[in-house]
């Protein structure tokens, strides 16, 4: 999973500002935590890049990084 900066967190909230958590390259995907999320009341947008031929193993690793970062379940 080597490559350019891969995971950036944007927007207000407890983890505000861009932070580099994982590294993947390729097309962009966006996951938005909605404002009704009780643990992140102001909402948050996660933007990360994946290889176009992403394997399930890489996707699972990335989900694991997200879980460790937030220390909570998240919706896809």
Curated annotation (Swiss-Prot):
Top-level taxon in the UniProt lineage: Eukaryota
Which residues does the annotated region (Disordered) include? 1-20
Name this protein carries in UniProt: Protein CASC2, isoforms 1/2
């Amino acid at each position: 999973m080597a490559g350019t900066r891969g995971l950036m967190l944007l927007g207000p909230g407890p983890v505000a500002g861009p932070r580099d958590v994982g590294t993947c390259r390729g097309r962009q995907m966006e996951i938005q935590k909605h404002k009704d999320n009780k643990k992140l009341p102001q909402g948050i947008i996660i933007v990360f890049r994946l290889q176009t031929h992403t394997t399930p193993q890489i996707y699972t690793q990335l989900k694991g990084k997200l879980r460790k970062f937030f220390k909570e379940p998240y919706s896809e």
